[in-house]
């Protein structure tokens, strides 16, 4: 693998670049192989690289946080913490920030969203949904992988001497990232080699195949596994790696001030790109001495100019503007170093563009240069330093480019390495739209959260019920989870029926019955299922009696005494026909002597023998279908809250059964605020909310009435136990309440202000992502999921026809 290397041409630099430009070393030997061009000596299994004879480095990968979407106060905190992070590095440590955008094999992403046909009656909608996912993936940039690294190097006589110090620096870096709320981890040797392999093969799809055992078996070196077929540095402005064209450039910072969006703009490009920021701290005393020396030089030049002015007969205060500018800049830097906790850094910002053709390369470089110009900077090609630029773009923390710019801590920190978080998980992940900032697909697995409980919040017409149905559809196609829906508005039956589920219509005229007294032997953690069931019966009776402040202790005691008597027959012989009903509890209460028992029985009478006796029957519907929808739309006002509470208890029964089968249960509660509005049902609902997680339940509350929801005393418990919130458009008053409750920044709040249908904010653990989800209205699935009255009417007409 032979390469061509022409002579080098000097490179020009700015005022401060001239101060710190190193003389170029003469090249003693002509490198004849690709491997010898790669500038490191050894790469250890543990990730420690011997770069030069006495130079060793390690690399840490770090992930993004939501900097661009943060509140100004939070932005300032992040920025100040990032300044502290930079100030950690003393003059003995070189470090390099690497930002790599490279195209990935789309097949890896397709595997995550793949839905295989099952050759059943659902294949038409299943394949339709799969096609929709592929179309959404194509809209984004998920095929472009963005990774971020920090590499640090120190000088040492041997690896034994270097290792403990590198590990100590690594620990400090990880702790500093932790302060910033940034996830990070150190790379091993294979992972570091893979980065270099991908840098040298950016336009290729072949995967990196390497293990340290391969070296022992083949006798090759690590460089043999990462090197391209050839390097060609014939031109002074670009080069070739194998069949790939490349160009290395540096950022010439001309602007007096930069915005913290400058790096984000470069990284937002949808092309292969490597941005490397090499940073070398200058010893504080040396930096101050150096700047004082430059000020002295400038003052001397100023005096000479003034003498010249006097001799020429014009005002001695008139001096060259550059001299005044440089003098002011130098004095400001000195003040920063002496009194503002600033350090001085020597910084080199490099860009590596690659492409399959020369035309594509020129286009990519032109686009990159355009962004630089937008921020009053210039992107200059490294004339006859292309090899040094390429090799300095490798994460080795060894800068071979002799062009450096002196910057203070604050000026260096303006290259904030954080933009917006992405969420694309493997496993049982579900689709939640596209990232509104990056346009990348959002795939997340709620079951990976500490608390998978969730809320879907939005104004009427914002798409909250549609979003719930889309998740239900996704769950049905990609998991084995059971799905239960509490449907107070009769909106879910078209989808449930289309997926082969069971719709249970509960009303005063319906023949579908569910028994609120149903219990199974696994109803609680311990061997006493009646303990947990008692909580439900008490909540039920409180709701029936309208006891806003709860029942009296005597009343609770009477019920608690009756329950073992009522359930005795079933617990002795657990057959379905032995299951008690509300009528059995009513009869038992009538037999008690206390007046409290008679009071409770009287309250129950209308639900046992009167016009509201719909819940005084044995369950007569099968509840073992994978998808069950409890349609309680036709229940009157008196029964709706009661019905929702009873449905919730039926769900708990199902969850306890599924737990033994190691199966998850998804539970969707529309009009969730109704359960939290009454103290009686709110307390029980929160208890269920807390217990669901360890029993394999994944509940989702859906509501448009944010004020009613937040008015509940129990809402704090709901939010604390909900790590997933899908927030759509919000009314003005609700936005302010939610902003305070969830600490949402004004910029983030704009995504739920007058937003279109299917747009909003996704809260996944500590991650907040703005999303958009435009669903194709021509799909059959759309007609099954829509809740728009006119479109639902068309579905009914079509079904009846």
Which stretches of residues belong to each language-model region?
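Extended, folded cores of ATP/NTP-driven motor/assembly subunits in large transport
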Residues: 2-418
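P-loop NTPase motor domains
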Residues: 65, 72-91, 98, 102, ...
């Amino acid at each position: 693998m032979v390469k061509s290397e022409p002579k080098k041409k000097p490179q020009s630099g700015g005022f401060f670049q001239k101060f710190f430009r190193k003389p170029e070393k003469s090249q003693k030997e002509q490198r004849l192989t690709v491997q010898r061009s790669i500038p490191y000596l050894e790469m250890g299994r543990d990730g420690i690289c011997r770069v030069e004879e006495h130079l060793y480095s390690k690399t840490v990968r770090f992930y993004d946080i939501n900097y661009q979407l943060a509140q100004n106060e939070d932005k300032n905190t992040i920025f100040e913490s990032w300044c502290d992070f930079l100030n950690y590095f003393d003059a003995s440590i070189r470090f390099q920030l690497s930002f790599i955008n490279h195209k990935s094999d789309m097949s890896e992403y397709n595997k995550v969203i793949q839905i295989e046909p099952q050759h059943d009656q659902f294949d038409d909608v299943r394949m339709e949904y799969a096609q929709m996912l592929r179309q959404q993936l194509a809209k984004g940039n998920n095929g472009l992988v963005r990774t971020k690294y920090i590499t640090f190097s120190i000088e040492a006589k041997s690896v034994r001497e270097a290792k403990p110090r590198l590990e100590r620096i690594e620990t400090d870096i990880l702790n500093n990232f932790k302060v910033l709320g940034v996830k990070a981890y150190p790379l091993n040797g294979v992972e570091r080699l893979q980065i270099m392999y991908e840098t040298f093969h950016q336009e290729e799809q072949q995967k990196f195949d390497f293990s340290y055992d391969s070296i022992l078996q083949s006798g090759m070196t690590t460089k043999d596994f990462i090197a391209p077929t050839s390097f060609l540095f014939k031109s002074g402005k670009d080069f070739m790696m194998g069949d790939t064209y490349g160009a290395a450039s540096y950022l010439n910072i001309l602007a007096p001030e930069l915005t913290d969006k400058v790096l984000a703009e470069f990284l937002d490009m949808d092309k292969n790109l490597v941005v490397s920021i090499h940073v070398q701290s200058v010893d504080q005393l040396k930096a101050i001495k150096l700047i004082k020396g430059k000020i002295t030089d400038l003052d001397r030049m100023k005096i000479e100019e003034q003498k010249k002015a006097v001799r020429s007969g014009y005002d001695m205060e008139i001096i060259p503007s550059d001299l005044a500018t440089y003098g002011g800049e130098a004095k400001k830097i000195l003040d920063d170093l002496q009194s503002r906790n600033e350090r001085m850094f020597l910084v080199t910002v490099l860009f590596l563009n690659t492409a399959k053709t020369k035309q594509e390369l020129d286009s990519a470089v032109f686009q990159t240069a355009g962004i630089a110009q937008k921020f009053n900077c210039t992107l200059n090609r490294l004339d006859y330093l292309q090899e040094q630029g390429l090799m300095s773009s490798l994460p080795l923390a060894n800068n071979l480019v002799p062009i450096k710019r002196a910057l203070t801590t604050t000026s260096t920190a303006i290259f904030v390495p954080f933009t917006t978080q992405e969420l694309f998980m493997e496993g049982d992940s579900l689709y939640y739209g596209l990232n509104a900032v990056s346009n990348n697909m959002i795939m997340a697995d709620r079951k990976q959260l500490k608390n998978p409980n969730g809320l879907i919040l939005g104004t009427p017409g914002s798409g909250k019920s549609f979003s719930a149905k889309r998740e239900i559809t996704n769950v049905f196609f990609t998991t084995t989870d059971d799905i239960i829906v509490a449907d107070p508005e009769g909106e879910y039956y078209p989808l449930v029926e289309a997926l082969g589920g069971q719709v249970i219509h509960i009303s005063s005229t319906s023949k579908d019955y569910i028994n609120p007294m149903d219990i199974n032997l696994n109803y609680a953690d311990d061997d006493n299922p009646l303990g947990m069931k008692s909580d439900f019966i008490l909540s039920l009776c409180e709701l029936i009696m309208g006891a806003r402040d709860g029942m009296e202790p005597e009343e609770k005691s009477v019920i608690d005494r009756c329950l073992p008597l009522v359930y005795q027959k079933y617990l002795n012989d657990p057959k379905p026909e032995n299951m008690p009903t509300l009528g059995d509890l009513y009869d038992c209460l009538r037999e008690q002597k206390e007046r409290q028992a008679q009071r409770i029985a009287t309250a129950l009478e209308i639900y046992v023998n009167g016009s509201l006796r719909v819940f005084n029957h044995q369950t007569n519907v099968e509840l073992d279908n994978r998808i069950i929808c409890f349609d309680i739309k036709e229940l009157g006002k008196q029964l709706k809250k009661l019905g929702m509470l009873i449905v919730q208890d039926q769900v708990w029964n199902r969850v306890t059964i599924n737990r033994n089968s190691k199966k998850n249960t998804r539970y969707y509660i529309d009009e969730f605020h109704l359960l939290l509005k009454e103290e009686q049902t709110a307390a029980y609902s929160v208890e269920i909310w807390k217990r669901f997680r360890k029993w394999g339940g994944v509940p989702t509350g859906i509501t448009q009435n944010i004020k009613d929801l937040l008015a509940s005393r129990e809402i704090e418990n709901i939010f604390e136990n909900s790590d997933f919130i899908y927030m759509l458009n919000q009314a003005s008053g609700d936005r302010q309440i939610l902003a305070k409750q969830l600490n949402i920044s004004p910029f983030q709040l704009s995504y739920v202000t007058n937003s279109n249908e299917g747009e909003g904010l996704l809260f996944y653990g500590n991650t907040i992502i703005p999303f958009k989800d435009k669903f194709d209205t021509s799909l059959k699935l759309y007609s099954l999921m829509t809740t728009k009255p006119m479109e639902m009417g068309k579905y009914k007409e079509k079904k009846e026809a």
